[in-house]
């Protein structure tokens, strides 16, 4: 089972907002490490924010302290949702040395990572978090 979450960068507070795709309400804020820091938080979702998260269509493991069982990231434009690109599959193949389309490297570097570090991610190019697991929806 999978749930789609839209991740939006709030550069004024230096946080990433997670919310179910199609929902108008803001989701819980997750702190973003600075560009020079490689450390990560233990939990992708602060426990204090769990009560404010609309849990419809999310897997049961999403609100657990250890996070969802499996996360996948895709990218898409709001105007062309049919053309999502699976970042996890591409990255896994690259790590194994398998041939991949070389279009991904400049796309990820120029469109996502550079803009993320600069805090200028275009609202038309969001990242979506796909939580896939064997748990039932809440």
From Swiss-Prot:
Function noted in UniProt: Multifunctional protein that plays a role in silencing host antiviral defenses and promoting viral transcription. Does not seem to be essential for HBV infection. May be directly involved in development of cirrhosis and liver cancer (hepatocellular carcinoma). Most of cytosolic activities involve modulation of cytosolic calcium. The effect on apoptosis is controversial depending on the cell types in which the studies have been conducted. May induce apoptosis by localizing in mitochondria and causing loss of mitochondrial membrane potential.
Chain spans, region Mitochondrial targeting sequence: 68-113
Entry's localization field: Host cytoplasm; Host nucleus; Host mitochondrion
Annotated family: Belongs to the orthohepadnavirus protein X family.
Domain of life assignment: Viruses
Keywords, alphabetical: Activation of host NF-kappa-B by virus, Activator, Apoptosis, Host cytoplasm, Host G2/M cell cycle arrest by virus, Host mitochondrion, Host nucleus, Host-virus interaction, Modulation of host cell cycle by virus, Transcription, Transcription regulation
A Pfam family recorded for this sequence: X
Modification after translation: A fraction may be phosphorylated in insect cells and HepG2 cells, a human hepatoblastoma cell line. Phosphorylated in vitro by host protein kinase C or mitogen-activated protein kinase. N-acetylated in insect cells.
One Gene Ontology cellular component: host cell nucleus
GO BP, sorted A to Z: DNA-templated transcription; symbiont-mediated activation of host NF-kappaB cascade; symbiont-mediated arrest of host cell cycle during G2/M transition; viral genome replication
Region (Disordered): 24-48
Protein name: Protein X
Disulfide pattern: none
Subunit structure, interactors included: May form homodimer. May interact with host CEBPA, CFLAR, CREB1, DDB1, E4F1, HBXIP, HSPD1/HSP60, NFKBIA, POLR2E and SMAD4. Interacts with host SMC5-SMC6 complex and induces its degradation. Interacts with host TRPC4AP; leading to prevent ubiquitination of TRPC4AP. Interacts with host PLSCR1; this interaction promotes ubiquitination and degradation of HBx and impairs HBx-mediated cell proliferation.
